Amino acid sequence: MSVVTSIRKSLVPIHREGYPFIAIAVVIALGLMVFSTFLGMIGVGLAIWTALFFRDPPRVTPVRDGLVVAPADGRISQVGLARPPRELDLSDEPLLRVSIFMNVFNVHVNRAPVTGRIERLAYKPGLFLNADLDKASEDNERNGLVISTPLCRVGVVQIAGLIARRIVSFVREGESIGVGERFGLIRFGSRVDVYLPVGTRVLVSEGQLTVAGETVLCDLSAQQPRETAYRVS
């Protein structure tokens, strides 16, 4: 193994969506360095922070029918019943909603909570309230998708926050997606809601920290637990 390969493997991968922002931060740092070493170092720190924000580390995802994994890194902010956004055409009645709040220090690449087919994809412009507020689910800019599985339909909604002003989606309607696969990204702080059938067994609690693609949120299966496989992505 070459030295270059060793160094490359030791570095945290950066998602391509971050390249323009990192480049801008580097240019600013170089410009500040011309006027002041102190200001230049602040610029370098900003560039490093920007790169870390767009980091995209590999994850080891548990793979078993019925398991629902966290779509985002962050903190469980709410677990309860709520009506899903109308544009998803998911249900007119309240469903189980698990909300994950992401701060600006979390990884912001979002991963599919289940394996299935993307039945619907819907973007809705809106406000930029604090994503930790309950009404952010209704009023903020959001991008939602419905994933159809053999057991049920699962709704996933990316919600913009105070700082986040751009939701990025990597998928299209009709495509198949595997649990733990990347489906989108929200820039600079936000929230992700997962909508599930009422009665789903929840395995997390409010305040708990989550890791996208790894933390198991719920179990949709009523069967006895079977052997769980794991996949790195």
Swiss-Prot record:
GO biological process, one term: phosphatidylethanolamine biosynthetic process
EC primary class: lyase
InterPro entries per record: PS_Dcarbxylase (IPR003817), PSD-A (IPR033175)
Catalytic residues as annotated in Swiss-Prot or TrEMBL: 190 (schiff-base intermediate with substrate)
Taxonomy, superkingdom: Bacteria
Post-translational changes noted in the entry: Is synthesized initially as an inactive proenzyme. Formation of the active enzyme involves a self-maturation process in which the active site pyruvoyl group is generated from an internal serine residue via an autocatalytic post-translational modification. Two non-identical subunits are generated from the proenzyme in this reaction, and the pyruvate is formed at the N-terminus of the alpha chain, which is derived from the carboxyl end of the proenzyme.
Residues flagged as site, Cleavage (non-hydrolytic): 189-190
E.C. number: 4.1.1.65
A Pfam family: PS_Dcarbxylase
Record bears the keyword Lipid biosynthesis: yes
Predominant localisation class: membrane
Cofactor: pyruvate
Membrane topology label: Peripheral membrane protein
Pathway: Phospholipid metabolism; phosphatidylethanolamine biosynthesis; phosphatidylethanolamine from CDP-diacylglycerol: step 2/2
GO molecular function: phosphatidylserine decarboxylase activity
Keyword terms, alphabetized: Cell membrane, Decarboxylase, Lipid biosynthesis, Lipid metabolism, Lyase, Membrane, Phospholipid biosynthesis, Phospholipid metabolism, Pyruvate, Zymogen
Cell compartments where the protein resides: Cell membrane
Catalyzed reactions: a 1,2-diacyl-sn-glycero-3-phospho-L-serine + H(+) = a 1,2-diacyl-sn-glycero-3-phosphoethanolamine + CO2
HAMAP family per the UniProt record, alphabetical: PS_decarb_PSD_A
Record-stated family: Belongs to the phosphatidylserine decarboxylase family. PSD-A subfamily.
Subunit structure of this chain's protein: Heterodimer of a large membrane-associated beta subunit and a small pyruvoyl-containing alpha subunit.
Described function: Catalyzes the formation of phosphatidylethanolamine (PtdEtn) from phosphatidylserine (PtdSer).
Listed name of the protein: Phosphatidylserine decarboxylase proenzyme
